């Protein structure tokens, strides 16, 4: 009986040595990282509103049920100069905001979203004043007590351009239309749209411009005449929903 008990105790001790938490070093039990890490080029749009950019920080490792904390920091201009040696300019802190810079993960949380809000007016003006520079926001994760994946710890945002979206007709060429005398009503579709990806709900207003007709006739030596009011109709206000770049008038 004593010998049997000794064997059982020895077996139990041997098995405990091979449990996962004993095989994996403590620093790998929970590891934090940025989902879309690395260098990301970002185009901003002048819309009269702040532009937003979202990214996520994840908690992984051999035991992601553990709690964890991490902070989002920004490399200084001196650090960027030393790391890259090119004409990068770190975006001034008053040109943007972050909804949070510290992330505390509960046991059941595997990821947290972070949203950046950037001022296109301020960034665009800085780019115009210093056209040789590329403006960047070099973010990185840091934690006093938890591990960070060194390969996915940084998000280096480069501002590729600041554009003003424009709405226009998809075809601006003269399009002659022929109708038989005495017809009742005839419809024609005229395409219009946005020249960039549409992240907004755009309200478009349409009107007839007699001055444009006069200018066109004078420039091209034509004698086009405007249809009398009441002989045509169109929706003066049209919406271009988010996610849609073109539609018909």
What residue ranges belong to the model's regions?
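Sec-dependent signal peptide recognition
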Residues: 1-3
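Acidic/polar, low-complexity intrinsically disordered N-terminal segments immediately downstream
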Residues: 14-113, 122-204, 210-215
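C-terminal motif of bacterial Sec signal peptides marking the signal peptidase cleavage site
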Residues: 8-12
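Active-site-adjacent structural elements in folded domains
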Residues: 98-100, 231-236
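Ligand-binding face of N-terminal immunoglobulin V-set domains in extracellular IgSF glycoproteins
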Residues: 113-119, 248
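Short proline/glycine- and polar residue-rich coil/turn motifs
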Residues: 103-111, 226, 237-246
């Amino acid at each position: 009986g004593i010998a049997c008990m000794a064997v059982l105790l020895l077996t139990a001790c041997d098995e405990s040595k091979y449990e996962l938490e004993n095989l994996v070093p403590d620093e790998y039990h929970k590891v934090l990282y940025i989902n879309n890490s690395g260098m990301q080029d970002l185009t901003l749009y002048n819309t009269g509103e702040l532009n937003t950019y979202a990214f996520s920080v994840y908690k992984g490792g051999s035991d992601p049920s553990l709690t964890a904390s991490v902070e989002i920091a920004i490399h200084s201009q001196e650090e960027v100069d030393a790391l890259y040696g090119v004409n990068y300019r770190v975006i001034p802190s008053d040109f943007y905001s972050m909804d949070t810079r510290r992330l505390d993960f509960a046991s059941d949380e595997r990821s947290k979203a972070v949203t950046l809000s950037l001022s296109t007016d301020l960034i665009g003006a800085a780019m115009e004043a210093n056209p040789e520079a590329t403006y960047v926001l070099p973010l990185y994760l840091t934690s006093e007590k938890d591990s960070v994946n060194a390969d996915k710890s940084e998000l280096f945002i480069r501002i590729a351009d600041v554009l003003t979206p424009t709405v226009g007709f998809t075809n601006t060429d003269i399009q002659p239309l022929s109708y038989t005398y005495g017809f009742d009503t005839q419809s024609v579709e005229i395409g219009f749209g946005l020249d960039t990806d549409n992240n907004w709900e755009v309200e478009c207003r349409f009107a007839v411009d007699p001055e444009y007709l006069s200018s066109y006739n004078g420039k091209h030596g034509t004698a086009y005449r405007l249809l009398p009011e009441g002989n045509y109709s169109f929706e003066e206000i049209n919406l271009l929903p988010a996610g849609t770049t073109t539609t018909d008038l």
